[in-house]
């Protein structure tokens, strides 16, 4: 099992402050929220839209935050760059691709717009794991979590090649790059409850935003 960085805290903080200048962040907000029935990114959480919490969390990691969406009027006020979605639309794979294409730094954190409980420490650790790899992707059981991951800009071309072949699954390009899977027992050391990877897909999931749930 990968051990969490044991360097003295001051040295680790200094390392992360330097890293912030070389990390981009990409928020995927191009979905149609059909199962939710309304825009998931704008759902209220603690008095603010979820996407506002997401962007604020990412500010601790990056000086280059992009929201991938064709709705600049909705997401522009949250203080991130707005990047038009891939055309023709092809789901999250296209969103990640255009985000990487416009990223200002070689490495990017990618998250979905409906993840209210992002854990900065976990994301920093995933970034730290990226040395020598093109993609660092947590797993839940045997399933990858590609919308809470770290990718290099070099992933852009393999992604587009897969899209041009008709692929839509984000994981389709993993065989074409240097992949670092992160098994569940590893990342749960930093997030035992697994809250960071929670996203909201249906109205029933909104119960997770109630105080008894998010204070657990």
Q: What does each of the following model-derived ranges do?
A:
Residues 3, 12-14:
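Short, positively charged and aromatic/hydrophobic N-terminal segments
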């Amino acid at each position: 099992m990968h051990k969490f960085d044991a360097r003295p805290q001051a040295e680790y903080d200094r390392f992360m402050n330097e890293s912030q200048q070389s990390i981009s962040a990409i928020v995927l907000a191009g979905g149609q929220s059909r199962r939710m029935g309304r825009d998931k990114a704008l759902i209220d959480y603690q008095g603010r839209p979820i996407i506002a919490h997401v962007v604020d969390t990412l500010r601790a990691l990056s000086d280059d935050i992009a929201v991938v969406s064709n709705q600049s009027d909705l997401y522009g006020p949250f203080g991130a760059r707005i990047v038009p979605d891939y055309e023709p639309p092809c789901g999250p794979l296209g969103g990640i691709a255009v985000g990487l294409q416009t990223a200002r730094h070689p490495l990017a954190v990618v998250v979905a717009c409906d993840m209210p409980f992002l854990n900065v420490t976990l994301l920093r650790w995933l970034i730290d794991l990226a040395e020598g790899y093109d993609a660092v992707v947590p797993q839940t059981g045997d399933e990858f979590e590609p919308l809470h991951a770290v990718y290099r800009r070099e992933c852009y071309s393999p992604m587009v090649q897969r899209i041009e072949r008709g692929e839509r699954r984000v994981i389709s390009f993993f065989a074409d790059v240097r992949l670092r899977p992160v098994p569940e027992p590893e990342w749960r050391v930093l997030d035992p409850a697994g809250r960071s990877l929670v996203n909201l897909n249906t109205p029933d999931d909104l119960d997770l935003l109630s105080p008894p749930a998010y204070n657990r």
